[in-house]
């Protein structure tokens, strides 16, 4: 059995070798000659999986080591009898920590306390629900918008988008990209929404680029709309708008979910799904794959305040480290993908054990996702 894996999927060769012969290939583009006689294909979001890619091949299973699936024509796969699996929630923690890093950077720059802000979360799935829980643990007021869940009668107080836009200080988008239908999210943030958004607000998009109409956002900013903007995803990618990049506060190359833990979860989830598909179910302990972080322990004396928390968060990951490289090379052919391919290793907060002498602080840090030890 021949299994193709994206060369940037960590641990993929090590794991999938248990099931067959493995060939690592670039994800954009995948060489046609490698596909012809392959039995399975494991991709990331950079690979468009559809009839044009797979027609005439022997591929019988596709796995994407990503939470989102808008790059995969799963309807066509189903019609062809091709097995398919994604990795829902694999990078949710990473995206949450990216959003926190961006908010803490802005709090430091603009002199506010995050606890004093109201955060509107649009899309309350794997990412949005975790973000909501961590913000609430910190004492931040949150407003939730999720029309599909609201229509199902889920036990949450959901807000209509048009009302949330007027009430929230921060809008952060965590929806799938639905181009049609009752829950269309394509260009959810359009000219009308941006016009309704009061000046001084923060807008964050770390889900899919086209959820925010990039042309409309650029028009609004060029006309003097006073917004702080964080974009990790763009419309289109990899050929993002340079004028828009110049006007956003934080711009990064679609790496919000790029922690080592998040990538490894994606790989292990599709590996386990494929092994199940073959009738050879195997499970993987994530911790057995991950290296010991270079910086793993820190002692915190006294009570935890927001300043100390910001320093802890940014010790593990500071979003500014990914903003500057994109601005330096944006517009150069292939550089967007190169930044992603050669992304500097990034860990999640759980990789840092904070030794505390205050039980309340230890409890809060644990709720936020840090590993803690009470002294």
Swiss-Prot record:
Binding-site residues, substrate: 45, 66, 258
Keyword Cytoplasm in record: yes
Catalytic residues in the record: 208, 237, 254
Record-listed E.C. numbers: 1.1.1.290
PROSITE patterns to which the protein is assigned, alphabetical: D_2_HYDROXYACID_DH_1, D_2_HYDROXYACID_DH_3
Catalytic activity: 4-phospho-D-erythronate + NAD(+) = (R)-3-hydroxy-2-oxo-4-phosphooxybutanoate + NADH + H(+)
Keywords in alphabetical order: Cytoplasm, NAD, Oxidoreductase, Pyridoxine biosynthesis
GO cellular component terms, semicolon-separated: cytosol
Domain of life: Bacteria
Cell location: Cytoplasm
Pathway(s) where this gene product acts: Cofactor biosynthesis; pyridoxine 5'-phosphate biosynthesis; pyridoxine 5'-phosphate from D-erythrose 4-phosphate: step 2/5
Swiss-Prot/TrEMBL GO biological process terms: 'de novo' pyridoxal 5'-phosphate biosynthetic process; pyridoxine biosynthetic process
MF annotations from Gene Ontology: 4-phosphoerythronate dehydrogenase activity; NAD binding; protein dimerization activity
Positions of NAD(+) binding: 146, 175, 232, 257
Free-text function comment from the UniProt entry: Catalyzes the oxidation of erythronate-4-phosphate to 3-hydroxy-2-oxo-4-phosphonooxybutanoate.
Quaternary organization: Homodimer.
Similarity field: Belongs to the D-isomer specific 2-hydroxyacid dehydrogenase family. PdxB subfamily.
Name of the protein: Erythronate-4-phosphate dehydrogenase
């Amino acid at each position: 059995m021949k299994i193709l894996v994206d060369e940037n999927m960590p641990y993929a060769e090590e794991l999938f070798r248990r099931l067959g012969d493995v060939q690592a290939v670039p994800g954009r583009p995948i060489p046609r000659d490698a596909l012809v006689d392959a039995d399975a294909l494991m991709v990331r979001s950079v690979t468009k999986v559809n009839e044009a890619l797979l027609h005439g091949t022997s591929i019988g299973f596709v796995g994407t080591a990503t939470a989102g699936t808008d790059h995969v024509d799963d309807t066509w796969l189903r019609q062809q009898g091709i097995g398919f699996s994604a990795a829902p929630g694999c990078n949710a923690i990473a995206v949450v920590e990216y959003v926190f890093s961006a908010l803490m950077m802005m709090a430091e720059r603009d002199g506010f306390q995050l606890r004093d802000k109201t955060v509107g979360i649009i899309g309350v799935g794997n990412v949005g629900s975790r973000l909501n829980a961590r913000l609430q643990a910190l004492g931040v007021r949150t407003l939730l918008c999720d029309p599909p869940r609201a229509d199902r009668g889920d036990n949450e107080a959901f807000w209509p988008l048009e009302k949330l836009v007027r009430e929230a200080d921060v809008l952060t988008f965590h929806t799938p990209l639905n181009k049609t239908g009752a829950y269309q999210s394509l260009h959810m943030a359009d000219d009308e929404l941006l016009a309704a958004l009061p000046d001084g607000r923060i807008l964050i998009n770390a889900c899919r680029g086209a959820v925010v109409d990039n042309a409309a956002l650029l028009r609004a900013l060029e006309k003097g709309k006073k917004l702080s903007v964080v974009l990790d995803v763009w419309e289109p990618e990899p050929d993002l708008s340079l004028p828009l990049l110049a006007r956003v506060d934080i711009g990064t190359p679609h790496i919000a979910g790029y922690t080592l833990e998040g990538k490894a979860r994606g790989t292990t989830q599709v590996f386990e799904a494929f092994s199940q598909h073959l009738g050879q179910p195997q499970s993987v302990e994530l911790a057995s794959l991950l290296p010991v972080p270079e910086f793993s322990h820190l002692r915190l004396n006294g009570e935890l305040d927001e300043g100390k928390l910001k320093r802890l968060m940014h010790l593990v990951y500071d979003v500014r480290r990914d903003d500057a490289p994109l601005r330096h090379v944006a517009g150069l052919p292939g550089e967007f993908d190169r930044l992603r391919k050669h992304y500097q290793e990034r860990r999640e907060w759980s990789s840092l054990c904070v030794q505390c002498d205050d039980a309340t602080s230890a409890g809060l840090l644990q709720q936020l996702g840090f590993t803690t030890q009470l002294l």
